[in-house]
């Protein structure tokens, strides 16, 4: 085995072939970081047949003028079951970054620690406890099992839906009642989905602004999304849910005809048997449905006059690789939330994964707090409704490479933090 630099082609071919390969360990992310002006390294291990068996994208940032901070975002991509390989990689990586004036090395591997349900109850262990001892022996310090959303650290909890050996019908069957109803609702009510181009990205951004204002969370800036759409190319998809009013109103008219037919039948049943309570209840229920149907038709015609035949209602931002589809961000028009456009977006992308043989649909980050007063309690309930599971990752590890200078650096940082 040998530790070596990799070409982008070698790196991409390997990371695309591996499980637990995060979108930040892809050629698209490498090209993005180069364009942003970061010092970037592609490194890995090759076996005696010159085949890549481990790979890692590293970025380096200047620290204290003469040193650098090296970071591998969700790297390396490696067979973590091969502990000998893991040891060799991190040992050689430390030597490599030392040659490049590294002050300290930071990693947050895409490696599960344990599994939980959406109530926060542990359902299983990922059998990676050994990794903590291994990293400690190699000189890495674990930063702790942090929870919540941090502007610097990667989120440690993901909500993930397993699609392996499942059909679309299986997914719907396993949803809770609300998710089933809304998924069927958008399939029925003329809600369509198409993918936005780079020129149309402002539509998505407007929805994100609506959502961030209503839910009081900090969104990324425009540059973040535009750059990833540009450099990730077909590894980013931005689905837009919209109402096609011609189809929507047509379907509502067809529904009205059926309801009127059923109502007339119920009225005839009452004429024949006035004492039949079931017929009276059925009449009342059908009349309520008809009233609601009429309101929807009136609303649809009004909105069609105001907005034209197509009305954008929701959009999402997704990262794609052979391992998983990642729901990174999404927003919905507050004025048209009742059309349940976000469910159309989710259903479109779940089916995208199924149709492309991708076994994992990642709803992405949750805080890991699982309490009613947690900042993301509504989001957790939404993801829980799809019958997803929670994966908790091992977290962050830091290795001081130049120990004396790193000690001085951390001491100065603590003083600065106290002052400011």
Curated annotation (Swiss-Prot):
Keywords assigned: Acyltransferase, Cell shape, Cell wall biogenesis/degradation, Cytoplasm, Peptidoglycan synthesis, Transferase
Coarse class of the protein's main subcellular location: cytoplasm
Recorded catalytic activity of this chain's protein: beta-D-GlcNAc-(1->4)-Mur2Ac(oyl-L-Ala-D-isoglutaminyl-L-Lys-(N(6)-Gly)-D-Ala-D-Ala)-di-trans,octa-cis-undecaprenyl diphosphate + 2 glycyl-tRNA(Gly) = MurNAc-L-Ala-D-isoglutaminyl-L-Lys-(N(6)-tri-Gly)-D-Ala-D-Ala-diphospho-di-trans,octa-cis-undecaprenyl-GlcNAc + 2 tRNA(Gly) + 2 H(+)
Top-rank taxon, per record: Bacteria
Any one GO cellular component localisation term in the record: cytoplasm
Statement: the UniProt record of this protein carries the keyword Zinc: no
Subcellular location: Cytoplasm
Free-text function comment from the UniProt entry: Catalyzes the formation of the pentaglycine interpeptide bridge, which is characteristic of the S.aureus peptidoglycan. Adds glycines 2 and 3 of the pentaglycine bridge, using glycyl-tRNA(Gly) as donor.
Membership in a protein family: Belongs to the FemABX family.
Protein name, as recorded: Aminoacyltransferase FemA
Species, as recorded: Staphylococcus aureus (strain bovine RF122 / ET3-1)
């Amino acid at each position: 085995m040998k530790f070596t630099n990799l070409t982008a082609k070698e790196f991409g071919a390997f990371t695309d072939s591996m499980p637990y390969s995060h979108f930040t360990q892809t050629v698209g992310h490498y090209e993005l970081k180069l364009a942003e002006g970061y010092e970037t390294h592609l490194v890995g291990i090759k076996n005696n047949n010159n085949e890549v068996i481990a790979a890692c994208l590293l970025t380096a940032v200047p620290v204290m003028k003469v040193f650098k901070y090296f970071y591998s975002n969700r790297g390396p991509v490696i067979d973590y079951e091969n502990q000998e390989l893991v040891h060799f990689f991190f040992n050689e990586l430390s030597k490599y970054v030392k040659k490049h004036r590294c002050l300290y090395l930071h990693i947050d591997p895409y490696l599960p620690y344990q599994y939980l349900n959406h109530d926060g109850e542990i359902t299983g262990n990922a059998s990676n406890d050994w990794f903590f001892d291994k990293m400690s022996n190699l000189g890495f310090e674990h930063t702790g099992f942090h929870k919540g959303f941090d502007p610097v650290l990667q989120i440690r909890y993901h909500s993930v839906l397993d699609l392996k050996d499942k059909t679309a019908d299986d997914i719907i069957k396993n949803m809770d009642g609300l998710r089933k109803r809304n998924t069927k609702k958008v399939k029925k009510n003329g809600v369509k989905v198409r993918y936005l181009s780079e020129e149309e990205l402002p539509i998505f951004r407007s929805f994100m602004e609506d959502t961030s204002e209503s839910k009081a969370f900090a969104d990324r800036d425009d540059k973040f999304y535009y750059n990833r759409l540009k450099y990730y190319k077909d590894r980013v998809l931005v689905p837009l849910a919209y109402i096609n009013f011609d189809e929507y109103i047509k379907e509502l008219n067809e529904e009205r005809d059926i309801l009127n037919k059923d109502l007339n039948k119920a009225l005839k049943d009452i004429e024949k048997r006035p004492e039949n309570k079931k017929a009276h209840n059925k009449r009342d229920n059908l009349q309520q449905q008809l009233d609601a149907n009429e309101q929807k038709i009136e609303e649809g015609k009004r909105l069609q006059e105001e907005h034209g035949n197509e009305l954008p209602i929701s959009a999402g931002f997704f990262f794609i690789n052979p391992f998983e589809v990642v729901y990174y961000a999404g927003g919905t028009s507050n004025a048209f939330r009742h059309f349940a456009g976000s469910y159309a977006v989710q259903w479109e992308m779940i089916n995208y994964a199924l149709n492309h043989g991708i076994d994992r649909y990642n709803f992405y980050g949750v805080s890991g707090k699982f309490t009613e007063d947690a900042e993301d309690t509504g989001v957790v309930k939404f993801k829980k409704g799809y019958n997803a599971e929670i994966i908790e990752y091992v977290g962050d590890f830091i290795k001081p490479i130049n120990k004396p200078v790193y000690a001085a650096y951390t001491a100065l940082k603590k003083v600065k933090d106290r002052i400011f």
